[in-house]
């Protein structure tokens, strides 16, 4: 371990079902090991790429034993391991090996240069908030889940609109007929919420955003509320209504079920390279400051 590093054990997590990911992961592990750090692999990653040289740990073991986890994958990989490691406050470093990469911000081509710098202490730390959700049926909790991006109540593709009764901190907000409702963290504001015309929330903003999905009334607009609010969504009518968490787990709902959503007591520490800018990420990923060429306009 480098003398000025606060880390000793580094866990590596890879994107599942990704051909060719084994070689860059093992090369990165070898590089980090040569710097004096202990290496461990997330168990599913180790099994998938056939690694036996280093210990294979379940997420709970990573939380207990590793000082930092490096994720090589897309945003979905980061969301999944982030939820599992949240109770342990294990910092995450994200290397983009997916498509968009809002939260895996280190370019794949730069990882061999940037990761050693970060492990030696050259990084910027940021805490990201989570949501916790509870589904109530007949007065009893039937399901609990964490969400990094969002909790989404929506209808199936072949059913009509759902009617949802929405309350905040016990105060009635509205009955909404729509295809569903998104409750998103600032991190999730650039995910499904953004494609449903929701606002972008800076990750350090202490807020949640409620975004209707294709509402019947055009006056049903997104609203930003304090992140210490409790949001309750009751199913008034509709068939085949579901709730999903980060689009990675879901459960079917029945009439009169209530979904309670609030900020989790857990946060997820993100580590970024020095000089990281959220605005630069938005500019790059959303192609701000890019204008169509006149050569591409047939009417010009």
From Swiss-Prot:
Residues that hold NAD(+) according to the record: 75-76, 149-150, 177, 179, 190-195, 214, 248
Biological role stated in the UniProt entry: Involved in the regulation of the intracellular balance of NAD and NADP, and is a key enzyme in the biosynthesis of NADP. Catalyzes specifically the phosphorylation on 2'-hydroxyl of the adenosine moiety of NAD to yield NADP.
Locations listed in the record: Cytoplasm
Protein name: NAD kinase
A Gene Ontology BP annotation from the UniProt entry: NAD metabolic process
GO MF assignments: ATP binding; metal ion binding; NAD binding; NAD+ kinase activity
EC nos: 2.7.1.23
Similarity comment: Belongs to the NAD kinase family.
Alphabetically ordered keywords of this record: ATP-binding, Cytoplasm, Kinase, NAD, NADP, Nucleotide-binding, Transferase
GO cellular component: cytoplasm
Catalyzed chemical reaction(s): NAD(+) + ATP = ADP + NADP(+) + H(+)
Residue numbers annotated as active site: 75
The protein's enzyme class: transferase
Source species, domain of life: Bacteria
The keyword GTP-binding belongs to this UniProt entry's keyword annotation: no
Known cofactor(s): a divalent metal cation
